[in-house]
Amino acid sequence: MIGTRLPAWTRVLACGVAGLSLMTISAKAEDVITLGASVQLSGPVANTGRYYQDAYNITIDKINAAGGVKVDGKPYKLALKIYDNQSNVNLSVRQYTQLVTTDKVNFLLGPFASNFALADSVISEKYRIPMVQGGGASDEIYSRNFKYIFGTLAPASNYFGSTVEMLKGLDPKVTNVALVYADDSFDVSVADGTRKLLKDAGFTIAADEKFATNSTDFTSLISQIKSKNVDAVLVAGHETEVLNFVRQSKSLAFDPKLYSFTVGVPTEDFRKALGKDANYAFGMTAWLPSADLKDRWFGDAAKFETEYKARFNYEPDYHAASGASDVEAFAEAIEKANSLDPQKVRDALASIKFDSLYGPIAFDKQGQINLPQIVVQVQDGKLVEIRGPAGQVNPPQYPMPAWNAR
């Protein structure tokens, strides 16, 4: 038998600690439930990682202000112990090991990005400590029959589901589509699912191209797609990649009738970074602050947005709302279990049903929820809901005008 060297993140390693912050609570240690997390607070995806740190903190503070979490009639305060993984997946795994074995946190909140959640959930499974995470959507995370990982992002394979439905009804008609995606767990899952969605809907996939994660130069790729005369381009990537794709599309005068992106478009940062060039871009989100979503602690989605922006001076997006619901899920599950025992809380998570500011939470047998994606578009510098679960909400600005005609 030939031995195979396992990836670094599958091995339990001594933990190197970076960027530790611990929320201080003036209660006795035995009256505190500590949630541990490793999040990207520096490095290439820190701009998104901050949503999770901030969402965790504001939600913990909100729950504590309301009296905390009760177990057997006794109130407990929540605390957060969080590390900066510097956008390094191997460091993240070491930090989750540290959180469980040395810091002795009670439960785990997740990182951002599917490749991190895929790796870090190995630790929660090994030590049988429940992790609720709203940063990883790859189908691969939930294909391993793990019992201790729960996720509040919908399956990546269906991210473009609502977008494909929209494409069917556009005039002028969409026929040829380009599918472009990064070479990472999330984006590959998106592409695999979207490929089937497009074929089932009768579209021709004129280009099907993968690029290296964290790519900055898309000129060759864009030129190749441009030569195919596609009507629509669907891009699965992370925010910096998406920004570069738009900027370089403009410089190469690449103007299909439509392009849509998995991330970036719903955020205030996207619109600020691109200015007028953000207009006409389509994207998706599982959450909007205008949605009629009520919860136990903030009241509703709009109040969450108001409090979040007042505290952190930027608008929350679905990453923040998902992160907040992760904390809420633990509060609900702990009270339902009436215990701090990890197995009992895990079992409570598996059967829990409650309304969060992010939407209804109920995990399937794989540990995932399936909220439908909302299609959004930037119109005149503002984010506009185009298609919701019940169909079209507002008319899209389509087709996208040529760059030199704007």
Curated annotation (Swiss-Prot):
Respond yes or no to whether keyword Signal is given for this record: yes
Superkingdom of the source? Bacteria
- Alphabetized UniProt keyword annotations: Amino-acid transport, Signal, Transport
Q: Please give the coiled-coil regions recorded for this protein.
A: none
Chain's role: Component of an amino-acid transport system.
The record's comment on protein family reads:
Belongs to the leucine-binding protein family.
Q: What is this protein called?
A: Leu/Ile/Val-binding protein homolog 5
Q: What is the lineage of its organism?
A: Bacteria, Pseudomonadati, Pseudomonadota, Alphaproteobacteria, Hyphomicrobiales
